[in-house]
Amino acid sequence: RDVERSRGLGDVYKRQGMEAACSTPPRNGMEIYTNTPRLRKYRKMILELLLSNHCGECTTCDKNGKCKLQELAARFDIHRVRFDNPKSKPCIDDSSVSITRDANKCILCGDCVRVCNEVQNVGAIDFAFRGSKMKVACSFDKPIGDSNCVGCGQCAAVCPTGAIIIKNDSHRLWKELNQEDTIAVAQVAPAVRVAVAKEFGYNGENVMGKIVAALRRIGFNYIFDTSTAADLTVMEESKEFADRLANGGKLPLFTSCCPAWIKYAENEYPEILPNISTCRSPMQM
């Protein structure tokens, strides 16, 4: 069985010449060289070509400091790109409520296409056109907000650059917090507690108290734990299941907690909508 192959700047396998790791499965008897002067030279040139076709606004990019392309450029000591980019800059696609797509930063690695089609089975994006005109796009080149995207965010999670990012509405938040008559309410999910702890080096610790203190100082009036609302959702769903079971209602009963799952069901499997719970998600509870 072939091993999973990743992007073309990985190892290069050598038999009688150079071959890209992304398209060459390992075979018995192969001699593999991964860090020779010749390979480093070619990798550096490929990186320069990628950078020439990439938006260079790194200091204002949301991925600054976490960008895979930026990391590779530093590793290969690239401080200047020798090639010009003749392409005109495409518009930023901000039509989705969940993500923002910036084709100026796309390096056509295909990770977003793969996770959308093969992992999530949504198929909202794919490669379009060929050659120098190739790009990642929705069907008929529509905005992502008009496609069958469910807003799961997996494409943003695997994107190595800032081509797809989770939509940032913090500017709207600060604007509202500055209004004196605004009552600000925050809700913290368990996953957020873990992510914040990891980000600040508190691995394995409960930082809920620190999060509450920080939110208070920012200007929030009320802070709730999503776990409480999740308990209410479980109670409501249990009651609904018992009622359906006793009265011959539609079974099996599917949860309604995830908005992305609900949209996926609406787009792909509308016949199961009567099986979905009528309870609100914990965020809405």
How does the language model describe each region?
Residues 2-9, 13:
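Single conserved hydrophobic/aromatic residue that forms the stacking wall/gate
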Residues 6, 40, 106, 110, ...:
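Conserved structured core elements
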Residues 10-11, 139-141, 237-242:
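Short low-complexity, flexible loop/linker segments enriched in glycine and/or proline
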Residues 14-151, 157, 164-176, 183:
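Fe-S ferredoxin-like electron-transfer domains
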Residues 165-285:
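Iron-sulfur cluster-binding electron-transfer modules in prokaryotic oxidoreductases
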